[in-house]
A protein has these predicted regions:
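Ligand-binding pockets and gating/stacking loops
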Residues: 1-176
Length: 176
């Protein structure tokens, strides 16, 4: 990279009329450095068994989301400023209790481990963890064919969000 930086600087001096050239070169260099870090971040075998167990990676129902949470922590450790992970299957219009109870089990342990891990490593105050969806749920049960479906419709006017770290005051509730 040093040789490349030297060549880029020499080229930029020869072409001062291209002011955006330096920014473009820096962007490419950053992308390269980030790509070089990826193999180390996704190789979770280097994590102690105790850590992998805390994230639920040894249990079928939590392994997938646990892997995402642990990789997210490792990306943050490497300086990545924004990490998004995903947990699907929450759009339950019927059989809400059954559907959500299994989804909750798949994310509870990994999310807890992520927050505890960030705190233990002294990273939680500088890292904002946000858990949210794109809409809330109506307060009443859906009715399908005259039968209550024990689910909820979409509510675009309300939603639930959990935030931890990043200077957010513990126990804060906004709204009613």
């Amino acid at each position: 990279l040093d040789e490349l930086a030297f060549l880029n600087q020499r080229h930029a001096k020869k072409h001062p009329e291209h002011a955006d050239l330096a920014a473009r070169m820096e962007s490419y260099e950053l992308a390269y450095r980030m790509q070089m870090e990826v193999p180390g971040v996704i190789d979770l075998k280097s994590e102690p068994e105790l850590v992998r167990e805390a994230y639920g990676m040894n249990q079928k129902e939590t392994a997938g989301f646990g892997r995402q949470c642990l990789m997210a922590r490792r990306l943050v450790e490497k300086g990545v400023r924004f990490v998004q992970i995903f947990s699907g299957g929450w759009d339950s219009h019927d059989y809400l209790e059954r559907g959500h109870s299994s989804r909750i089990k798949s994310v509870d342990k990994p999310m807890t481990a992520l927050i505890k891990d960030l705190k233990e490593k002294g990273m939680l105050e500088d890292t904002l963890v946000v858990w949210t969806g794109e809409f809330g749920r109506t307060p009443d049960n859906n009715r399908r064919g005259g039968v209550y479906a024990l689910g909820r419709g979409h509510n675009i006017d309300a939603m639930t969000m959990l935030m931890a770290g990043g200077g957010v005051k513990k126990g804060s509730i906004v709204g009613s």
